[in-house]
Regions:
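Catalytic toxin/effector domains delivered as secreted proteins or via bacterial secretion systems
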Residues: 3, 8-164
Length: 164
């Protein structure tokens, strides 16, 4: 299989992402550079948005082919983050980590205190890529999923993060 054929294969096939205990199926819709995606946030969210994706990497827009549950972490403080938001991750990507380690891995502006489940329906389009290191927030390196500015998902099962 040559490069063009393998690219077509992944665009048209259901891929299984296996990062430990969770497996979910999706279809790749489009691939962007991190720089293109970071510019989208500046153009569509706010001009001083910190670049969330690591420069020099690729960001994929995917379509979930089955209902999938992610998690979201937040601090629930005034001027902080809340239960409802645009960024999620796989549960096993934070399993066993302290709140400070989660903040560092996902370059969060505040140390999270809570976690909730976020159920996204089949057919939902989201983006996935590597977290950028951000001064004062964290070194990044985790795999993050963003909801592309959509107000979607069922946010439920709020609970304290272990270590709080």
């Amino acid at each position: 299989m040559n490069l063009d054929e393998s690219s077509d294969f992944f665009k048209n096939a259901d891929d299984v992402v296996d990062g430990g205990t969770s497996i979910f199926k999706y279809t790749e819709v489009k691939t962007f550079t991190a720089e293109e995606t970071n510019q989208w946030f500046i153009d569509n969210v706010k001009p001083d948005y910190k670049p969330p994706y690591k420069p020099g990497t690729m960001v994929e827009e995917i379509e979930l082919t089955e209902t999938t549950t992610f998690v979201r972490v937040y601090d629930n403080m005034p001027n902080g983050s809340g239960m409802y938001g645009s960024w999620v991750m796989k549960a096993e990507d934070i399993e066993g980590l302290t709140p400070q380690e989660i903040q560092n891995k996902f370059a969060l502006p505040n140390t999270p205190k809570y976690v909730c489940d976020v159920e996204l329906e089949a057919g939902t389009h989201i983006r996935v890529g590597e977290v950028n290191a951000l001064d004062g927030w964290g070194s990044g390196g985790g795999t993050q999923y963003d909801l592309i500015g959509q107000r979607i998902g069922d946010f439920k099962n709020e609970r304290l993060l272990e270590g709080n």
